[in-house]
Amino acid sequence: YDIRIPVDMNCKTIEQKIATLVKEIAEKRGVEAFYSILDETEPFEAAHNSPLVRAFTLGIMEAEKSRPTLIRKTGTGDMNVLGNQWNIPVVTYGPGDPHEAHTIDEKVSIEEYLKGIEILKKTLQHLKRLHDKKMQ
């Protein structure tokens, strides 16, 4: 099974809950039960007021002429690993429908791809401006 851990919990808490449940069920049914954890990645969520999130929001607003909707991406990825390991804000961004990511229906049009490049350019400009402003 693939368990998605909410950001207000951690892997150790989930492991303890699993161990307790497995033990209770095994005792109740009079059987031995085993499980193994093959991999784990702590949950991560960047602060919505971080300069990186702000820069992306501004870049998208400038390119799309509308305010983006921030969504919580559950699961594992570079964002979880880098954000937790380095204690830095990290976002996942890309063109296309995020609900179709890694499915048979995943696709990106040329128009979306080019718009994504424009958004990244504008985001980097805003990130530099926000960084320079903070350094003053």
List each language-model region with its residue ranges:
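Metal-dependent amide/peptide-bond hydrolase catalytic core
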Residues: 2-136
